[in-house]
């Protein structure tokens, strides 16, 4: 249906942001004060929380004197750099087929990202300009978009809430998209498979031409 738009959590639904985030956090914390991060600690203290809040909780357990606000700012910049480096590889043939299938249906794509916008625009240059919008994601939520991100992205692209759909890359993003009142699809990668994806209209294990059809049918596009 023409007029509908898909808000894409590029960092976690297109790029393998959950793995990049974990690796970045692991290296960052080790260099910061020798703090060892594993998947269990990440899930318990960081996932779904704001950077500062998550670090504050983790630092209390690690008994470090490092301050969470400063660490959060530095970590956000480090993640953005790593994410930007991964952009070209993220938009490979399979992801392109998924995107092209939506474009052929007249769907407008609104890409929310923390990566460098010029890098993302370059990777998506095959999409007609009139069917593409970009939103600078500024929230500091670890591994997810906040609920108001979805609404702001839709508003900036002039897509009414009833016509907006969300493509999320984590259980926390599914929850926030549902809170925003959006029909939601989720791309589930191994690193986030433990999260709760309940409420998503459809679960995808990858982006491809085949899953694009499944996506559009489930979300009535």
Q: What do these predicted regions represent?
A:
Residues 113-115:
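Conserved phosphate-coupling serine/threonine residues in phosphotransfer and NTP-handling enzymes
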Residues 34-35, 107, 159, 182:
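Short glycine/serine/threonine/alanine-rich loop segments
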Residues 3-93:
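N-terminal helical cap/lid subdomain that shapes the substrate entry/recognition surface
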Residues 81-111, 121, 147:
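Short, acidic loop-to-helix structural element flanking the phosphoryl-transfer center
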Residues 1-3, 117, 121-221:
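Asp-based, Mg2+/Mn2+-dependent phosphohydrolase catalytic module
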Residues 44, 49, 55-61, 109, ...:
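N-terminal-biased segments
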